[in-house]
Design a protein with these regions (language model features):
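A short glycine/small-residue-enriched secondary-structure motif
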Residues: 16-22, 46, 50-51, 78
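N-terminal glycine-rich anion-binding loop in soluble enzyme alpha/beta folds
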Residues: 1-41
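Mixed-charge interfacial surface used for oligomerization/domain docking
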Residues: 1-9, 64-68, 72-77, 83, ...
Length: 266
């Protein structure tokens, strides 16, 4: 869930508020905050599937960013006795945004290949740290507003056109890695990180997703460079919106790059 102004909304992929409107209202000064899904909501959601005789594999937003995975686990335990013939399995993605979207894309393929729910869960837990998440932001306003950097640092950073480059570590936390001066340089560097870490290097033949918050031109510039450097990609780079939960913290002006690679470190 997220708050925009004085109203609470579900994070429903832009259905309640279109993404462009959401980011425009943030840019105009409306405040945002987020809250995790509670146990009762998970109970109601999971039970809808269990009543139909279905098993559930729930893959959660990183525990390094949200406590929702704990609510999901409690709900799964509470339902186990009531529905002994079906199961709810919960996986901590240790990922976010289209990073764990890329994981879900692979898990759906495994399901469609006939793998059991346990086999799909085991793959997720064994491979989740091979999904790289790299982010940069061209607008420090919302990092200052959220208290992640000081007003002074934000002022100097903006004056010097500093773009922070972050990634997600092996515990699912977002970690600042570099401060890069200028948009062109940070676009080059984020693709350089893919060159350094992608499975197979320039021969990488997996999928690549990009997410962005109201900065399609920047996202397209990253995608074009990725497609130039990695000619064997599985299809074109897919560009999505950063959702409202993550976007509430980043604000507009953030681009995120996701791909399969070596194991993430601390």
């Amino acid at each position: 869930h997220y708050m925009l102004g004085d109203t609470s909304y579900p994070d429903d992929l832009g259905q309640s508020i279109p993404f462009d409107e959401f980011y425009a209202r943030m840019a105009a000064g409306e405040m945002t905050k987020t809250s995790q899904v509670n146990v009762d909501e998970f109970l109601a959601y999971f039970e809808g599937f269990l009543k139909e005789g279905k098993d559930v594999l729930h893959v959660s937003l990183s525990s390094g960013l949200s406590g929702s995975v704990n609510s999901a686990r409690i709900a799964a335990e509470e339902l186990a006795d009531k529905y002994p013939d079906n199961k709810v399995l919960v996986v901590d993605s240790l990922g976010a945004s289209s990073g764990y979207g890329l994981l879900m894309d692979k898990l759906a393929d495994l399901r469609d290949e006939g793998k059991s729910i346990e086999e799909v869960r085991d793959f997720a837990e064994a491979n989740r740290l091979h999904l790289h998440h790299w982010f940069f932001s061209t607008d420090l306003t919302f990092y200052v507003r959220g208290g992640r950097i000081s007003k002074a640092a934000g002022w100097f950073g903006t004056a010097l056109k500093i773009c922070p480059l972050l990634n997600m570590d092996d515990e699912g936390h977002l970690i600042p890695r570099q401060k890069i001066r200028g948009k062109k340089a940070v676009i080059q560097q984020i693709v350089k990180e893919m060159e350094n870490h992608a499975r197979g290097g320039h021969d990488y033949n997996g999928k690549c997703f990009i997410s962005m918050s109201a900065c399609m031109d920047d996202a397209r510039a990253v995608a074009d460079l990725v497609e130039e450097k990695f000619p064997h990609l599985n299809g074109k780079v897919m560009i999505n919106n950063i959702g409202t939960t993550i976007g509430s913290h980043t604000g507009p002006g953030t681009v995120a790059l996701f791909f399969w690679g070596d194991e993430r470190t601390h």
